[in-house]
Amino acid sequence: MPHGLITIRRGRRTDLPALAPLLAFPPTHDTDKKHTQHWRRLVSDPAHDFYVAEQHGTLHGMVLVSYVRTLVHLGWLAILNIAVEPLAPGDISHRLIDFAKARARKRGCQRLVVYVSGSEPQMALTPLLEAGFLRMGEVLSCSLQGRP
């Protein structure tokens, strides 16, 4: 889905080397193999939507939306994971979040949640809060009902 100079496209297995610095992978051979296997499973799993933000051939961020059924919420619940390069153009975070919301709505989800550990810098949470997420302890939650 093009957005001016920024393109949001489905992630590929070959994107791992470019995105690994965003995920802070330790550089050991054993973990590289495990991360590669994990990555390939994520990219090919139909229970996930994995997309990257690309600008002029450079990957600046990624979003993974996982879909689960829960006892509390009727239907599906969408769980968001997002990572954006700190020096990426300012609107990439917002575009990835909006894109994730649209994908989750398309799958029939009524809520999108993000789990936070408390160690995230405030600037990493700011785009989520600006996008309508509300903090409840270690969870940021956003209703997908109403306006897109």
PLM features: what roles do these ranges have?
Residues I6-L19:
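A short beta-loop-alpha structural element at the N-terminal edge
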Residues P21-K33:
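Helix-loop element at the rim of GNAT/NAT acetyltransferase active sites that forms part
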Residues T31-F50:
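Active-site rim helix/loop that mediates acceptor-substrate recognition in acyltransferases
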Residues V52, T58-Y67:
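Conserved beta-strand in the GNAT
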Residues I79-D91:
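A short, internal acetyl-CoA/4′-phosphopantetheine-binding micro-motif in the GNAT/acyltransferase core
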Residues R95-R111:
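Conserved acyl-CoA
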Residues V113-A124:
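Conserved beta-strand-loop-alpha-helix junction that forms the acyl-donor binding cleft
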Residues Y115-S117, L129, L134-R147:
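Conserved catalytic-core motifs of GNAT/GCN5-like acyltransferases
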